[in-house]
Amino acid sequence: MSELKQKQVFKEKVMHSEEEDVSPELNTQKTFSEKETFIPVEIEEQQKETEQELQLEQVIRPKSGRKWLTTGLFATFAGLVVWQAVDSVITAIQTADWLALGWVGFITTIASFGLGALGKELWKLRKLRNHFSVQEESEALIDSQSVGKGKAFCEKVAEQSGVLAENPGFDRWKNSVNPAHSDAEILEMYDSMVVSQQDKLATKIVSQHATESAALVAVSPLAAADMLLVAWRNFKMIDNLSKVYGVELGYASRIKLLRSVFVNMAAAGASELAIDASMDLMSMDLAGKISARAGQGLGVGILTARLGLKSMALLRPLPWYPERQVKLGAIRKEVVAKVASITMKP
């Protein structure tokens, strides 16, 4: 008896019928409407979050205000002072009151110095307003698709910023520009070749003042001295940054700029805290374990760095480009290293 199995014959009709019974809908055509297409919900949410962060990081500039009202009040006050001085001189000469004439001359001299100082402050305040208008104009050129305005605009910005024609970056930018470039491309090249050099100097200034403020607060035993010291260092930092970007500041314009910086820090606080809160808390915890004064110094250093970066954003002639924007993380590392080196010394 053979151990081999007998052959089995399968019919095609049976196979087809079985296949049809198992999967009757495999060959059926099915169309999808637009409502049934796949939608990447997570990507959209990430894009919305990114847009919200960018909106928070935008620079908030002060409003122009009533320029004509301020100029009119100053002109009226100056006219009244001159009128009063001339009338007093004529009256003193007619009555032969030489003592009154001397007092009139003395008071007129003091008033002229005061008017000159006030006029100088108003002029510097006007230049600061013009600087903000230049920033707005640069943003409009970057967002537009125009051609032919970018080179003249950048040359005007270079003149206002005190960039010399012999500057290597400015000379390289002029040689790189050709008529085929759009205004946005010309401004991007100017930012990468000229403004980036100013950014490097400004970043060094911010880093230096932040680390020095943190170190001074960490070793200072007096809270009142800390407050005065930090305020003086911050004003000095803003003055140095304004010189780097060629913005001349007076007393009134310095106060206006500082107020604008605080407004920007408050507006962007939510976004920055969401990004940097963990690192700040980690740094504060590290310094707090070493000493309480080190923790205070580290907090002051980070606050000074934030103040400096917001000042840079307001003093730059062009808006930040994301790939070249100075981040707080690099400066924070230097502040932490400085405070740690001071507090860990035996």
From Swiss-Prot:
Compartment(s) where it occurs, according to its Swiss-Prot or TrEMBL record: Cell inner membrane
Membrane topology field: Multi-pass membrane protein
Keywords for the protein's UniProt record, in alphabetical order: Cell inner membrane, Cell membrane, Membrane, Transmembrane, Transmembrane helix
Keyword Transcription regulation set for record: no
Recorded GO CC terms: plasma membrane
Keyword 4Fe-4S: no
Skewed-composition ranges (Basic and acidic residues): 1-17
Principal localisation: membrane
Annotated Pfam families: DUF697
Transmembrane segments: 73-93, 98-118
Record region (Disordered): 1-28
Family: Belongs to the UPF0283 family.
Protein name, as recorded: UPF0283 membrane protein VIBHAR_01918
UniProt source species: Vibrio campbellii (strain ATCC BAA-1116)
